[in-house]
């Protein structure tokens, strides 16, 4: 037996002539018929428009002529195994306006128009290209030379020998970046592997483009050199089974059968079959086939025109169909067939297997062709001159309607050094579906053939009349919608075996209807985002199923399964021997209800995970058993006071067993929530289980947490806990603070609740801390101490001291005359204390003058502008300042000197930090810093030309800071004004050594000590409080700091001079490095 590819020509010749014929036939006729993306045969119709999705609306049942209800029995092709529904007649029509343009995507190139028709763009934009998916193509055509097409690099091609049994692989690798092209001459009998050596832009190839090349390009052709017309799945691996019998236009059945075997052996899951046996039954109405199997077999043979001998029956039904059935059942393969181009009411015979064998339906999809208005193509091709025109166009889905959909009949491909080739025929409708199936398998690699065909069929766009009918099948392929999973379960239960680990999640985002159910297997997670109305049961045997919306189905959770309700959701009855999880992953804070519209049974082996504020509402009876895990994490439970209250977590019309039947109860109170006991209450509306909860003492909790904190944070953690406890004592005393309503009503600033109105945001922020993870206690309490204010102020004061010292050093080396100098100074360092590190950075630019004001007196003054930054933990500070520095030195002959120093600066400290559990606060504070210093030095001769000076003295720092209030959080800090004075002792050595009459080197070493310490902590309270007070934390600035430096002065001549300095100040915990360069002019 021989078959032909489904080109729209009577006798296919895969040559340039055949292509030319295909491109010249542009007339299309036809009408009526339609498909649907849902399995309801009495659903209302939808139009076809821009980015529209099929929807169903109930309407009166439609009578379908020619179909008897009893024929539905055991006829999966008609009724999907159901005996209570009918199928539209193949000629059924519905009065409706003409369908609009089907373009739903927006690929701009006209050669990609067929991709817009199937809404491909969402799939491409999501990054799906078919990578990692193996696709088989059983086809024919002159294609040995075409393996040098760069668009098809990576394609694996297999020919066959004369016995149609042994295939030789021709494997093309990626095109190398260098090397020229070469023609490849090989026979299909060669036992060799061919590797091309060609660049995508330098290809010499055969003149003829075969049918096999065109089909391959539609599925997996790559876009080369910027050309837009690539295939549907350009990264898929293509296995080409060339079954050419030597005539270039026909295929041997034995070769086809063996091709399927070889693809199955290679693990190929998706197979494109753009061929078929030409129908000779004309418009024979196979809907009238009687129920008996023998009559069907005879009608099938009559329809196919096959050989009626025993050998013909063996080849047609035992060999071909038996081969298909085996691979569908045992190899999990999906076979996609074209309907053919005879403009007949029935498709080619290869796709009829499910009519004969019901279970085969899960592995076969038949594809009809549609034009851009959604109707079938009818093409006219004229034969020899003087003959009547012969009509050719897409065959209808016919009796394969339940496993049939439609795809564009026309497409465009482009090979290197060719213009775009316009092609037409169901040969190219089928690979459009095949390519989409490859994208789908890339996204859901666990999908079975049944999963794939269910998803592709049920997401099709509804075109034409309503219902799965004999023209369009399920409707027009919608690739974008298919990538969101199935839209219906019409073929029985949908088994999702999501193989993998629990950290991998897959999502179905369509609303799912149908009479089937869902069986969840495998370790990975499956998420349902739609509002689902399917009526079959949902059984979770393994992994987790997450519901983001409503689910009408009754649920059963097995021991290795988990059901997660994310957010407010509802569903049917629930029976669980596994895990039922109600805690939110996003901790949104809403008082959400999971509504079970039926009964609840928690068996002894299962576990209920829930949290305070989440209510499990059961309309029927609740039978309680197993383990309860109650968490106080999240915000839903609201603020808890020290007295406590009941928080319900389960309500039912009746709780059939006492709550004590929870065999084990575990609780997670979070940071400050204490869960005391479970209580059962009965009311007019049913029974309720509640937990009695109260808050813990923040100061004691923080003190305990400080034991495990780094030494540098202990004080801040304890201070933050004390601040929070003071605040919660105030909240406890406010009106109605213990009720859940407090959070919502106070947030709305209701005038009828004046006692709590000022605390709306404060209750929410405090509640978030109460219910936070206990492991985050150190971080949270530290943030409530706001240490960044004191620490950044201390860092700024130290840097201003470094800048004043620079003025002091300049007095020692000014020389004679008036000197003007400009300098830039860069500071940086770290402050590590008890395992906690802070970082500082600073930059200052100064201009100033220095001059001899008398025979033994030198004076200097500079103006500086600077910016410094400080970062610690999750807080950052930026300090901008402007300061005046001045100094005077008086020499007492060669013995020594006296110095007076002064600085005054204003600063603005801008703070950004996290506070509490998950809030953010920002603030700014203004202040001034004045410094006064008095120093004396004694000169000691050193070597022949050098000088050594011993210097000592005192400096007084006076810091004044304004009051401030942070914004953005009720747990931000509202600080009082601050005044702090610090006396600093100074001592050091200075060494100067001239190198010449124009260059001098300097070295310094010394010590600074705060004689009375410095305390920049800020008293105040949280911005969300009205009475509670506290103070910020602070690092302990080292009282004693070592200082050292190196430098040089150079005279350039003509009055110009320059300087360079490096200095260090620090201790074991603290270090500040400073570099300074300047240039001056001496008058």
Swiss-Prot record:
Q: What Pfam families does the record point to?
A: Autotransporter, PATR, Peptidase_S8
Q: Tell me a GO cellular component.
A: cell outer membrane
Q: Which residues form the signal peptide?
A: 1-27
Q: Where are the transmembrane segments?
A: 819-828, 844-852, 858-866, 883-891, 897-906, 931-941, 948-958, 984-994, 1000-1010, 1041-1052, 1057-1066, 1074-1083
Knockout consequence?
Altered processing of autotransporter proteins IgA protease and App. No longer processes extracellular LbpB. Increased biofilm formation.
Domain (Peptidase S8): give its ranges. 111-483
Query: What GO biological process terms are annotated to this protein in UniProt?
Result: protein processing
**Inducing stimuli:** The translocator domain alone accumulates during growth under iron-limiting conditions, cell-associated full-length protein accumulates later (at protein level).
Q: What is its EC number?
A: 3.4.21.-
- Name the InterPro entries on file: Autotransporte_beta (IPR005546), Autotransporte_beta_dom_sf (IPR036709), Autotrns_rpt (IPR013425), Peptidase_S8/S53_dom (IPR000209), Peptidase_S8/S53_dom_sf (IPR036852), Peptidase_S8_Ser-AS (IPR023828), Peptidase_S8_subtilisin-rel (IPR015500), Peptidases_S8_Autotransporter (IPR034061)
Q: What SMART domains does this protein's entry cite?
A: Autotransporter
Q: Which UniProt keywords apply?
A: Autocatalytic cleavage, Cell outer membrane, Hydrolase, Lipoprotein, Membrane, Palmitate, Protease, Secreted, Serine protease, Signal, Transmembrane, Transmembrane beta strand, Virulence
List, from the UniProt record, the residues annotated as the active site of this protein: 139 (charge relay system), 211 (charge relay system), 427 (charge relay system)
- Which PROSITE patterns does the record cross-reference, listed alphabetically? AUTOTRANSPORTER, PROKAR_LIPOPROTEIN, SUBTILASE, SUBTILASE_SER
Q: Mind telling me what this protein is named?
A: Neisserial autotransporter lipoprotein NalP
**Organism of derivation:** Neisseria meningitidis serogroup B / serotype 15 (strain H44/76)
The top of its lineage is: Bacteria, Pseudomonadati, Pseudomonadota, Betaproteobacteria, Neisseriales
* Gene assigned in the entry: nalP
């Amino acid at each position: 037996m021989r078959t032909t590819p489904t080109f729209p020509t009577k006798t296919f010749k895969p040559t340039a002539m055949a292509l030319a014929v295909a491109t010249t036939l542009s007339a299309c006729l036809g009408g009526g018929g339609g498909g649907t993306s849902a399995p309801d045969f009495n659903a209302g119709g939808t139009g076809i428009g821009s980015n529209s999705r099929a929807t169903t609306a109930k309407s009166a049942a439609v009578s379908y002529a020619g179909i008897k209800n009893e024929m539905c029995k055991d006829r999966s092709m008609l009724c999907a195994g159901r005996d209570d529904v009918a199928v539209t007649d193949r000629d059924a029509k519905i009065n409706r306006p003409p369908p609009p343009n089907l373009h739903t995507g927006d690929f701009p190139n006209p050669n990609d128009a067929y991709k817009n028709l199937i809404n491909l763009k969402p799939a491409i934009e999501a990054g799906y290209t078919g990578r990692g998916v193996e696709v088989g193509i059983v086809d024919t055509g002159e294609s040995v030379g075409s393996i040098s097409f760069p668009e098809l690099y990576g394609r694996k091609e297999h020919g066959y020998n004369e016995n149609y049994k042994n295939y030789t692989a021709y494997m093309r690798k990626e095109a190398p970046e260098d090397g020229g092209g070469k023609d490849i001459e090989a026979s299909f009998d060669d036992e060799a592997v061919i590797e091309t050596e060609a660049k995508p832009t330098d290809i010499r190839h055969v003149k003829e483009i075969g049918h096999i090349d065109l089909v391959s390009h539609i599925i997996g052709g790559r876009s080369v050199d910027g050309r837009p017309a690539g295939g549907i799945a350009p990264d898929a691996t293509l296995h080409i089974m060339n079954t050419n019998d030597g005539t270039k236009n026909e295929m041997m059945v034995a070769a086809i059968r063996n091709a399927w075997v070889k693809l199955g052996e290679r693990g190929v899951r998706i197979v494109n079959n753009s061929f078929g046996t030409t129908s000779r039954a004309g418009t024979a109405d196979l809907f009238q086939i009687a129920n008996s199997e023998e009559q069907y077999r005879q009608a099938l043979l009559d329809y196919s025109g096959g050989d009626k001998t025993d050998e013909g029956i063996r080849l047609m039904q035992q060999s071909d169909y038996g081969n298909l059935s085996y691979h569908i059942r045992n190899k999990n393969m999906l076979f996609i067939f074209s309907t053919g181009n005879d403009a007949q009411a029935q498709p080619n015979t290869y796709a009829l297997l499910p009519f004969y064998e019901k279970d085969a339906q899960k592995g076969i999809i038949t594809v009809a062709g549609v034009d851009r208005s959604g109707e079938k193509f009818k093409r006219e091709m004229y034969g020899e001159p003087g003959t009547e025109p012969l009509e050719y166009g897409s065959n209808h889905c016919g009796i394969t309607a339940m496993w049939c959909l439609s795809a564009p009949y026309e497409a465009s491909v482009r090979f290197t050094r060719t213009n775009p080739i316009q092609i037409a025929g169901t040969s190219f409708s089928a690979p459009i579906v095949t390519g989409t199936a490859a994208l789908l398998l890339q996204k859901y690699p666990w999908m079975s053939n049944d999963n794939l065909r269910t998803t592709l069929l049920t997401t099709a766009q509804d075109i034409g009349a309503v219902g799965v009918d004999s023209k369009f099948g399920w409707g027009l392929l919608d690739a974008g919608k298919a990538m969101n999973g199935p839209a219906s379960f019409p073929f029985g239960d949908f088994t999702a075996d999501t193989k993998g680990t629990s950290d991998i999640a897959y999502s179905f985002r369509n609303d799912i209807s149908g009479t089937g159910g869902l069986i969840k297997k495998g370790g990975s997670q499956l998420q349902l985002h739609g509002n689902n109305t399917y009526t079959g049961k949902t059984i979770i045997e393994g992994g987790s199923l997450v519901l983001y919306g409503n689910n009408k189905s009754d649920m059963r959770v097995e021991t290795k399964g988990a059901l997660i309700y994310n957010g407010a959701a509802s569903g049917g009855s629930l029976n669980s021997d596994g895990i039922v999880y109600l805690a939110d992953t996003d901790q949104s804070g809403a008082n959400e209800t999971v509504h079970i519209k039926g009964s609840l049974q928690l068996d002894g082996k299962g576990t209920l995970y829930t949290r305070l504020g989440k209510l499990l509402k059961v309309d029927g009876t609740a039978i309680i058993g197993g383990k309860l895990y109650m968490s106080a994490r999240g915000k839903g439970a609201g603020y808890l006071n020290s007295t406590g209250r009941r928080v319900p977590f389960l309500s039912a019309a009746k709780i059939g067993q006492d709550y004590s039947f929870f065999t084990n109860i575990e609780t997670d109170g979070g940071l400050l929530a204490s869960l005391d006991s479970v209580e059962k209450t009965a009311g007019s509306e049913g029974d309720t289980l509640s937990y009695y909860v109260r808050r813990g003492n923040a100061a004691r909790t923080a003190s305990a947490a400080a034991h495990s904190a780094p030494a540098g944070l202990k004080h801040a953690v304890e201070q933050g806990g004390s601040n929070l406890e003071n605040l919660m004592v105030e909240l406890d005393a406010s009106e109605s603070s213990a009720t859940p309503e407090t959070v919502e009503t106070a947030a709305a600033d209701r005038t009828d609740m004046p006692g709590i109105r000022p605390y709306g945001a404060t209750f929410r922020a405090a509640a978030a801390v109460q219910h936070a993870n206990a492991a985050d206690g150190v971080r949270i309490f530290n943030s409530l101490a706001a240490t960044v204010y004191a620490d950044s102020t201390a860092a700024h004061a130290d840097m201003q001291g470094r800048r004043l010292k620079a003025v002091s050093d300049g007095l020692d080396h000014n020389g004679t005359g008036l000197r003007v100098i400009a300098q830039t100074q860069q500071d940086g360092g770290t402050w590590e204390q008890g395992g906690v590190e802070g970082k500082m950075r600073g930059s200052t630019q100064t201009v100033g003058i220095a001059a001899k004001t008398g025979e033994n007196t030198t004076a200097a003054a500079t103006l500086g502008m600077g910016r410094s930054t400080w970062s610690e933990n999750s807080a950052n500070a930026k300090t901008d300042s402007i300061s005046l520095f001045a100094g005077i030195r008086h020499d007492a002959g060669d013995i020594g000197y006296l110095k007076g120093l002064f600085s005054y600066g204003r600063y603005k400290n801008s703070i950004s930090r996290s506070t509490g559990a998950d809030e953010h606060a920002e603030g700014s504070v203004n202040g001034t810093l004045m410094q006064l210093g008095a120093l004396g030095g004694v000169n000691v001769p050193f070597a022949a030309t050098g000088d050594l000076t011993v210097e000592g003295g005192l400096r007084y720092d006076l810091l004044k800071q304004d009051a401030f209030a942070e914004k953005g959080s009720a747990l931000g800090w509202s600080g009082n004004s601050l005044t702090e004075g610090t006396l600093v002792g100074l001592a050091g050595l200075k060494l100067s050594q001239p190198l010449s009459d124009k260059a001098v080197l300097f070295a310094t070493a010394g010590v600074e000590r705060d004689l009375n310490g410095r305390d920049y902590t800020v008293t105040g309270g949280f911005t969300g409080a009205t009475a509670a007070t506290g103070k910020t934390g602070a690092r302990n600035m080292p009282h004693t700091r070592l200082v050292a430096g190196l430098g040089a002065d150079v005279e350039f001549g003509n009055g110009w001079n320059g300087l360079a300095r490096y200095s260090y100040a620090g201790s074991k915990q603290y270090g500040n490095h400073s570099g300074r360069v300047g240039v001056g002019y001496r008058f």
